[in-house]
């Protein structure tokens, strides 16, 4: 078995022997600069007493200058540190405690002489290997967290988070993970799997006494930035009484600030695939040689949005010896099985808490659909939102441009909504996500970027204005409500008369839905005012055209061609739904091939309907990380 955990200093030492020079990946800061020469270096060749006196005076002045320069260096270094922290706070949060601890470790490694390196090596040798560590073992299936034998610090954090009794996925996965087993888990969204993998990970870091200089010991890979931020928030609460550092690296955030944090040492790291691969390949001060645990969350979603190649490269780069891997996926596809094969050790434990359930969706969720012509869809949505202003609602659309248009329109006519989609800058996405999480009421309109894994409190309604790509996407969308024990929620899906065949696929997927009826007298008819507004407002007209085009493109790229056939759409009615009296002239080429991203997505799906035959519309990438 491998020896003790290596330190950043020992890795630097090896790099020095191999490449020469100082072996450091980045330029030294003012703090790391060595002091100016001492007095003995001032006049080593002088022999007369007079010259020695002059040398002493000169040496004393040099000492004073060096001391002043050292103070200035410390001051400027601190200011730079504060600026970087501000940058990190606006782009992607990293624990403030990790900065302090990492600074201490860096300061302790400035001395380049052999004695200091031997001392660091000796300290690293004191860290036990995985074989020498005994994590708690549990007999039977515990019901409460206190029965797991966890450390006092972890139990205190769990208690402060308000958790006492475990969910089924937690009862069945935490004990084998504490025992060091590799796990392939499947559970419904909202089942509590985040704590299932974070608790064993934090216990392992604590037992091995990981320090910032030891680098990253636990790596969690997430499909979307919002889900990564959410996992980071849970990790921050769970680690609040531990000394280990934690952080996050995601696309759209400040890469330089992230690299600085990684070089200081982040023991528990949450990341999205693209940005993680970037740091693994290009941030040389990023120490991941001591990785002990790899968590891949929402693996099926990661592969669907086109990160298959990145995940294969990541798994290949990361050390595999003595590494525990946890792979969680809501559905088991061929690609997920392939990823499990290359990432998990032989004989993993497969845990599925859903296969015995009668329904694929959670209890407490009332699910319905409404059959509505295309020209009446917006009128029904407007009427529904107007009557439920005191509720917390999420509305799903098929494309970013559809979200942008409807957000601009609804806000313009004094029906306030928030928008979330992949074309927004990361800071805007983050602010919107947390604003809606903290709101007691309001409406969020979004693409499927918000459909997977996000734990948004107390959502009353899920509205699927545009149809999901298949039953799995439907399940993940409605999973944003009725989260947690005894929680309640409702969902409503809009279907056109030509789309009722989708109900058969939902039934096969064990999804119970009933038809909701909305009396015509309850629907506010604002069609004439809508058409007048779109005709007179240049910016809304332009946005409506973009939304109309994107809707048709997304519809044509649907995986269930037998149900969602773009050639069966009544374009006059569809255009009216976007506020046009007649369909606008737009540049769409029928018969064009699907994009590479959509092909990858559809190849990874199960046969829920007819497969792509190469006929469709050109469209832009539907999903964003």
UniProtKB/Swiss-Prot annotation:
Residues 601-613 have a biased composition (Polar residues). ATP binds at residues 187-194. Keywords: ATP-binding, Helicase, Hydrolase, Nucleotide-binding, Nucleus, Ribosome biogenesis, RNA-binding, rRNA processing. One of its GO terms (cellular component) is nuclear envelope. Residues 174-350 form the Helicase ATP-binding domain. It is found in: Nucleus, Nucleolus. A motif (DEAD box) lies at residues 297-300. Pfam families: CTE_SPB4, DEAD, Helicase_C. One of its GO terms (molecular function) is ATP binding. ATP-dependent RNA helicase involved in 40S ribosomal subunit biogenesis. Required for the processing and cleavage of 35S pre-rRNA at sites A0, A1, and A2, leading to mature 18S rRNA. Belongs to the DEAD box helicase family. DDX18/HAS1 subfamily. Associates in the nucleolus with the 60S and pre-60S ribosomal subunits. This is ATP-dependent RNA helicase has1. It comes from Aspergillus clavatus (strain ATCC 1007 / CBS 513.65 / DSM 816 / NCTC 3887 / NRRL 1 / QM 1276 / 107). The lineage of its organism: Eukaryota, Fungi, Dikarya, Ascomycota, Pezizomycotina. The gene is has1.
């Amino acid at each position: 078995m491998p020896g003790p955990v290596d330190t950043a200093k020992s890795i630097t030492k090896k790099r020095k022997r191999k490449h020469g020079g100082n072996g450091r990946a980045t330029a030294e800061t003012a703090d790391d600069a060595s002091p100016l020469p001492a007095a003995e270096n001032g006049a080593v060749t002088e022999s007369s007493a007079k010259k020695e006196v002059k040398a002493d005076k000169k040496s004393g002045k040099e000492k004073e200058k060096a001391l002043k320069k050292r103070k200035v260096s410390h001051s400027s270094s601190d200011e730079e540190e504060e600026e970087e922290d501000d940058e990190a706070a606006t782009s992607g949060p990293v624990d403030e405690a990790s900065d302090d601890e990492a600074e201490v470790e860096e300061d302790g490694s400035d001395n380049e002489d052999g004695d200091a390196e031997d001392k660091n090596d000796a300290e690293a040798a004191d860290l036990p290997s995985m074989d020498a560590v005994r994590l708690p073992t549990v007999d039977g299936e515990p019901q409460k967290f206190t029965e797991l034998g966890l450390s006092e610090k972890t139990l205190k954090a769990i208690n402060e988070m308000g958790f006492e009794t475990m969910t089924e996925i937690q009862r069945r996965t935490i004990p084998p993970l504490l025992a060091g087993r590799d796990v392939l888990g499947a559970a419904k969204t909202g089942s509590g799997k985040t704590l299932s993998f974070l608790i064993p990970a934090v216990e392992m870091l604590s037992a091995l006494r990981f320090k910032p200089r030891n680098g990253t010991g636990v790596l969690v890979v997430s499909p979307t930035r919002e889900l990564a931020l959410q996992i980071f928030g849970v990790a921050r609460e769970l680690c609040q009484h531990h000394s280990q550092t934690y952080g996050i690296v995601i696309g759209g955030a400040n890469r330089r600030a992230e690299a600085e944090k990684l070089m200081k040492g982040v023991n528990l790291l949450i990341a999205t695939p693209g940005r993680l691969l970037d740091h693994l390949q290009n941030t040389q001060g990023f120490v991941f040689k001591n990785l002990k645990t790899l968590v891949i969350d929402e693996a099926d979603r990661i592969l669907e949005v086109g990160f298959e190649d990145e995940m294969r490269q990541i798994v290949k780069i990361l050390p595999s010896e003595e590494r525990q891997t946890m792979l969680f996926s809501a559905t088991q596809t061929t690609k997920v099985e392939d990823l499990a094969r290359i990432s998990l050790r032989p004989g993993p434990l497969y845990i599925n808490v859903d296969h015995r359930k009668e329904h694929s969706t959670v209890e407490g969720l009332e699910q319905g659909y409404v059959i509505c012509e295309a020209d009446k869809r917006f009128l029904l949505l407007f009427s529904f939102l107007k009557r439920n202003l005191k509720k917390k609602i999420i509305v799903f659309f098929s494309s970013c441009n559809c979200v942008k248009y409807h957000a601009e329109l609804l806000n313009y006519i004094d029906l306030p909504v928030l928008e979330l989609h992949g074309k927004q800058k990361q800071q805007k996405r983050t602010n919107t996500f947390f604003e809606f999480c903290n709101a007691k009421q309001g409406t969020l309109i979004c693409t499927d970027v918000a459909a997977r894994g996000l734990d948004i409190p107390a959502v009353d309604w899920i509205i699927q204005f545009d149809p999901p790509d298949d039953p799995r996407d439907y399940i993940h969308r409605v999973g944003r409500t009725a989260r947690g024990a005894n929680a309640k929620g409702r969902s409503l899906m809009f279907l056109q008369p030509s789309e009722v065949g989708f109900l058969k696929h939902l039934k096969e997927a064990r999804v119970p839905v009933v038809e909701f009826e909305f009396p015509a007298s309850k629907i506010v008819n604002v069609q004439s005012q809508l058409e007048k507004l779109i005709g007179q407002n240049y910016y809304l007209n332009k946005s409506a055209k973009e939304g109309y085009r994107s809707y048709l493109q997304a519809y044509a790229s649907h995986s269930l061609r037998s149900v969602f056939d773009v050639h069966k759409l009544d374009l006059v009615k569809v255009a009216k739904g976007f506020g046009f009296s007649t369909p606008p002239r737009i540049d769409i080429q029928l018969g064009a091939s699907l994009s590479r991203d959509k092909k990858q997505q559809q190849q990874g799906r199960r046969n829920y309907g007819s497969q792509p035959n190469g006929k469709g519309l050109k469209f832009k990438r539907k999903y964003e990380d």
